[in-house]
Amino acid sequence: MTTIATATLPENVQRPQYDRSQLRSRIVHFGFGAFHRAHQALLTDRVLNNVGGDWGICEISLFSGDTLMSQLREQDHLFTVLEKGADGNQPIVIGAVHECLNARLDSLAAIIEKFCEPQVAIVSLTITEKGYCIDPATGKLDPTHPRIVHDLENPTLPQSAPGILVEALARRRDRGLPPFTVLSCDNIPDNGHVVKNAVLGMAEKRSPALANWIADNVSFPGTMVDRIVPAATAESLAEIAAVLGVDDPCAISCEPFIQWVVEDHFVAGRPAWETAGVQMTDDVLPWEQMKLRMLNGSHSFLAWLGYLAGHAHVSDCMQDNVFRRAARQLMLDEQAPTLTITGVDLEAYADSLIDRFSNPALKHRTWQIAMDGSQKLPQRMLDGIRVHLERGSRWPLLALGVAGWMRYVSGTDDAGQAIDVRDPLVDKIQQRVAQSDEQQRVDALLGLEEIFGRDLPHNVQFVAGIRAAWQQLATHGAREAVARALNS
């Protein structure tokens, strides 16, 4: 079978310029998803092209991804990233992945032992918010999570990411091996502390001495990641196959823009990521806050309200002047004033985001971005609203964004079509939707403490703002409600 590993590829395809036989699995990565392929794996590949070295990646997937992993092995762990710009496309074959393991194809025992190999210096993760098994209300490990319950009963055969990390670190300690750095690359606020809380929470339940050793020896740097990477579709894979002249089932498309800000605290070394344009810093939080509120907040705004209005893609929203103006106004008038970052031209940043959202080549579906809203609302919108409530400033578009999520999860768009709602809290949400009518819906959903906390449902201004926005959507539909908010 001909694959990208054996085919003669067109000259415009960038290929690894380093000796892949020198790679070792110095990075073990949880979650061989689209974003990781187009972001951390690509940037590590750039480092290898620039300065060489042995910083290979071992990809890990636990309970899914066995087909993808089999396909990756068949093409010598190579895969393609197609950077799609308004002015043309650039195909890049990534060679940084050295090996892969899957619980179904291999075994859980083999995966845990991989973490214990002496050369492993970094364990990185893109497992989404759900994978950390954190209780959103406390920010701590959720001891009632089914996988955490299992892992505490079966510590040497764990099934969760926190359980596997703790068992691997316990074995390394017992064998006299050095610790590794745990690097969350998920798009969640304060991701370093999230994974640290998960790991230490699990370790403390197993052994206070182990928890102390991890706290003293393991680092959990924060990161800010940014690149728009739509999920692969049959159409995007066919487009890449046409560019390459051969199928690549592991390929992914993305925008040309890429950014990675990393707290430079590694206990066992790291690749020279700065040679690939990565910003190594002492403090990631201001960058993360800027991105989550200005980029991700406006992305979710466009996803929920754009979908309700019938826009299938973010670029379709950008073709609609009402949504285009609203996204920029949301960024600059309501999100930017809540930030703590200094030395950044936020107007220029907003303009760059509008350009990126407008990229017609990406076909980033509003339905995809609208998923998992219960996990996204707090950091993308609610934290900014809390700042406005404290200051007494206005937040009409943020209110519309929150109410837009409420209408979206209610399950019907403005044309009366059913919505396929995907969310980890979908059962709780649908129960509250079913038990409330239009007039009660806002209060019913505000009762979800995992999302809104204890403060916001008791804040008179907040509740009034969301009720008013809900009424605008109910009366006028999403597009007209957004247009009215622009002129309010």
Regions found by a protein language model. Name each.
Residues 1-488:
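Substrate/ligand-engaging "lid" and interaction regions
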